[in-house]
Design a protein with these regions (language model features):
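Exported/periplasmic cell-wall-interacting domains
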Residues: 16-19, 28-109
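Cell wall/extracellular polymer interaction/catalysis modules
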Residues: 1-27, 51
């Protein structure tokens, strides 16, 4: 299996997907992804996803129905907050094929 995807925003160190070898913690359906809350309890964003597969703290693979394009150099300036954004058409198939403990290798070329 392979697909184009969008990783963390490369030119923003706080949003770059960290390189390294990780292992899938678990997988869950129908989650809402949020950053740490602001002092007033609100969130800067809330992203509902159908497929959530975390591998490094709050960083994981998930579907991204708000994106219409994947791959290429999008990650340089318009990447994610650190997660791997997958096309909806691919995310479900990938979710069904991966299990907790599966190695995840992240790197930039």
């Amino acid at each position: 299996m392979d697909t184009d995807f969008v990783s963390g925003t490369y030119y923003n160190a706080d949003r770059r997907t960290p390189g390294g070898t990780y292992y899938l913690y678990y997988k869950q359906r129908d989650q809402v992804l949020r950053p740490a809350p602001n002092p007033d309890g609100s969130y800067d964003y809330e992203s509902p996803v159908d497929y959530w597969m975390p591998f490094n703290g709050g960083i994981g693979l998930h579907d991204a129905d708000w994106r219409w394009k994947f791959g290429g150099s999008i990650y340089l300036y318009s990447g994610s907050h650190g997660c791997i954004n997958l096309p909806v058409s691919f995310a479900g198939k990938f979710y069904e094929s991966i299990e907790a403990g599966c190695p995840i290798v992240c790197f930039y070329r």
